[in-house]
Every structure is written in C-alpha cells, then in structure tokens.
Regions:
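Hydrophobic face of amphipathic alpha-helices that form TPR/SEL1-like repeat modules
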Residues: 43-50, 79-86, 113-122, 136, ...
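N-terminal leader/linker segments that initiate helical-solenoid repeat arrays
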Residues: 1-35
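Alpha-helical protein-protein interaction scaffolds
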Residues: 98-99, 106, 111, 120-121, ...
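Terminal, low-structured helical/coil segments at or just beyond the last alpha-helical repeat
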Residues: 145-180
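Short helix-capping/linker turns of helical repeat alpha-solenoids
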Residues: 21, 34-38, 50-52, 57, ...
Length: 180
C-alpha cells in the first residue's frame, strides 16, 4: 500500500504541546519522550523518520510513534497504521495496520477512515469501502483533501453498489459513529 508512504501526521489533538515540542532540540525531546510525554515521542519519531538532527532510522521512528500511539495520540496512531501497512520500520502487518487505523478513526481522524476505506476497496469489499469513505467525510479532525478524495471514491463505488447497499453502508457508518 505505497499510498501510505507520505505518513507524517501533525498532532492536532495536542496543539498546545505541539509548538513546544516542534521547536525542541533532539536532546530535550529525548528526555521528554523517555519521561513518557506523548507529544515529545511523536516529534522524536518525526526526527528519526526524516533524519532531522539524528541519523534517519525508520525503526526508531516506528518505536517512538508507537509509544505515542499507545498513549492515545491519534496522529501517532495514524502513522503507526501506515507504517504497518507499508512495512516501514516494522514488518508489514495488515491486521495491526487496521487496528491502529481504527484507533485513530475512533479518535475522529478522517485520514485513518480513508486508509481503512482503501484497505476494504483493495479487498473488493465495496460496501465496506463505501462505509469508511462515508466516515472519512464526517469524522472529527477533517482534512479537506481527504473529504474531496472520499467524495470522488464514493461516487465511483456507487456504480458497483445498489441503492440498498449504499443505504446499508451509510447506516453502518452512523452506527459506528454512535458507538464511539
């Protein structure tokens, strides 16, 4: 799934911390990350991901993103899902990718819903794909580019679905949102 290669996500849910961590030097980030601060773990992951002030190391990037993801930081959950999906810094694992995408989607990240939709579409589960594309147009942290892409995908998928299947997919999307 190389569509996931551009996997940097900005930690929108920790905006107050973001400015502080985004400007910290690597040594300070490492101290804060080791102290368990999810925002610092996320930004340290980006340093390793791109080789900014450290040697590029995708395994270290994955480890720090996962530490932040496991504390509930949705942009980190999205990154971990994408890294599992593509086998970047970790062995490729579709079920783990799905797990982390679902966590990020449950936190309202429509980019994660979009990734889940693409996974379903690759499996030719068009109703499931439609459901996730539908969710990606109305999840909490809305990315306008994702909304536009999702609307186009829904239109294309509708050609392969009956009106009843589309209604069912939308109903499932509604139920998924209500369950969150």
């Amino acid at each position: 799934m190389q569509a996931h290669a551009d996997y940097i996500a900005q930690p929108q849910s920790v905006a107050s911390q973001a400015a502080r961590f985004s400007t910290m030097g690597v040594n300070d980030l490492q101290k804060a990350a080791k102290a368990g601060q999810a925002g610092a773990q996320f930004y340290l992951g980006t340093h390793y991901q791109y080789g900014k002030d450290v040697a590029k190391d995708e395994k270290q990037a994955f480890a720090w993103f996962k530490a932040a993801a496991d504390q509930g930081l949705s942009p980190a959950q999205l990154n971990v899902g994408r890294m599992y999906a593509d086998g970047i810094g970790v062995k490729k694992d579709e079920s783990m990718a799905r797990k982390y995408f679902e966590k990020a989607a449950s936190n309202g990240d429509n980019r994660a819903s979009y990734n889940l939709a693409m996974m379903e579409e690759q499996k030719k589960n068009y109703m499931g794909a439609y459901q996730w594309y539908e969710l990606s147009t109305r999840d909490g942290m809305l990315d306008n580019k994702v909304i536009s892409l999702s609307e186009g995908k829904k239109t294309a998928l509708a050609a392969n679905l009956t009106q009843e299947q589309i209604r069912t997919a939308r109903d499932r999307a509604d139920k998924w949102i209500q369950a969150q």
